[in-house]
A protein has these predicted regions:
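Hinge/beta->alpha junction and helix N-cap segments in small-molecule ligand-binding domains
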Residues: 68-81, 98-104, 154-164, 180-225, ...
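Alpha-helical recognition/docking segments in bacterial nutrient-uptake
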Residues: 58, 62-167, 230-231
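N-terminal helix-turn-helix DNA-binding module of bacterial transcription factors
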Residues: 1-61
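Short acidic/polar active-site loop segments enriched in Thr and Asp
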Residues: 15, 61, 114, 174-176, ...
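Short gly/ser/thr-rich secondary-structure transition/capping motifs
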Residues: 43-49, 98-101, 120-121, 251
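Short acidic capping loops at alpha-helix termini that bridge into adjacent secondary structure
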Residues: 176, 207-211, 261-266
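Flexible loop/turn connectors
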Residues: 227-314
Length: 314
């Protein structure tokens, strides 16, 4: 039979309310009594009933992590980094519920969660943000700057980061630099393309319209996009890929064409995924602190304070 608060109270010679307060960190209990109760709870292998605890504290012990989309437009490494970061920020009592917006707002019951970490990827996501705020849901938005009031937003300057990637190639004397970008409505795609174009403009360079290809944020998409670039009469001498998955696909296409990176063609990715260390050659990539951003999102969930995450690039 499971040990209850009443069992601990009987052993400790105190009321069950005192035990409850001690286990929940109340300052109404003396340090001596709290230590005694915590020791007994450990000895008796007490495990809290989260449902009962939630009723008392008006908590669900559940955090919803919501993505714009899970089935497409979201790279697996990005998804995993987000979930790892959020998980690190939570206490052992909490559960994660993972959802996306594909089924429509009518399928969301935000009252089942104590708060929402929304990994936003596009402007149309604002509808969900307003929906959550209208329900007085505690909300933190990760990955996109939000101009709405009373929204905690954690993001990074992706335009500057993309400029950094292109400047890396320019500093190595590449001049015909192409871009394999993600889906056009995704905010990261918009910002990274803007950074690519800005860096070229600052270097008094332009790129042909067919130097920008959509790789769909996937390995297969990067492979096909690189094949299209290599098929051009005037081929690029370097490529900036807006995420690492596309860069890996591009690398495969380059190798299949009998070319080598970086001697024949330069290549830079984005996100600093672990797998980039294990390609041949290892991929140069721009670091985006996705996991740290998501972790900070979990930590800030109940603090309604707008904050821009500082630049944090390797």
């Amino acid at each position: 039979m499971a040990i209850t608060i009443k069992d601990i109270a009987l052993k400790a010679g105190v009321s069950h309310m005192t035990v409850s307060r001690a286990l929940n960190g109340s300052k109404l209990v003396t340090d001596e009594t709290r230590e005694k109760i915590l020791l007994l709870a450990k000895q008796l292998k007490y495990k809290p009933n989260l449902h009962a605890k939630g009723l008392v504290l008006n908590k669900k012990f559940s955090i919803a992590v919501v993505f714009s989309t899970l089935s497409s437009k979201t790279a697996p490494s990005f998804l995993l980094s987000c979930l790892n970061g959020v998980y690190q920020s939570l206490t052992k009592d909490y559960n994660l519920v993972i959802k996306d917006l594909s089924q429509g707002l009518e399928h969301f019951n935000l009252s089942r969660a104590d708060g929402v970490i929304f990994v936003s990827q596009q402007e149309s996501d604002d509808e969900f943000i307003r929906f959550a705020l209208a329900q007085c849901t505690k909300l933190v938005v990760v990955n996109r700057k939000i101009a709405l009031p009373n929204v905690v937003s954690i993001t990074v300057d992706e335009i500057s980061a993309a400029e950094m990637a292109v400047n890396y190639l320019l500093q190595r004397d590449y001049r015909k630099i192409a871009c394999i970008n993600g889906p056009e409505l995704i905010q990261s795609s918009i910002d990274r393309l803007a950074g690519y174009q800005s860096a070229l403009t600052q270097a008094n360079l332009t790129s042909a319209a067919d130097f920008v290809q959509d790789g769909g944020f996937s390995i297969a998409g990067g492979f096909v996009a690189m094949q299209r670039l290599l098929a051009l009469e005037d081929q690029p001498d370097a490529v900036f890929c807006a995420n690492d998955e596309m860069a890996i696909g591009a690398l495969k296409a380059i190798n299949d064409a009998g070319l080598k990176v970086p001697s024949d063609i330069g290549l830079v990715g984005f996100n600093d995924s672990e797998i980039c260390q294990y390609t041949t050659p290892s991929l140069t990539t721009i670091h985006k602190p996705i996991e740290q951003m998501a972790k900070l999102g979990g930590e800030r969930l109940f603090q309604f304070k707008y904050e821009i995450f500082k630049q944090w690039w390797k």
